[in-house]
Amino acid sequence: SGLSIPSNIAEGMERFSKKEKIRFLDIARASCAELITQIYIGIKAGFIEKNRGLEIKNEVEEISKILTSLIKGINNANS
């Protein structure tokens, strides 16, 4: 899911229609949620140190917020 975030952003931004752009950005945003879940699992299983995991989770949440803003901006664009 970590790799699918930038991959879906790139693919979406190459699309011509608003609908297609938004679809791929929404998939990227969903991948953020999936990655956050995997981070929590990694912390619980002892594979990720808790403080570092929470730092990464916060960064992923910020990326998700940016994607939400981008989706809203594309939705509101006049073209």
How should each PLM-predicted stretch be described?
Residues 1-79:
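Short, C-terminally biased terminal segments at protein or domain edges
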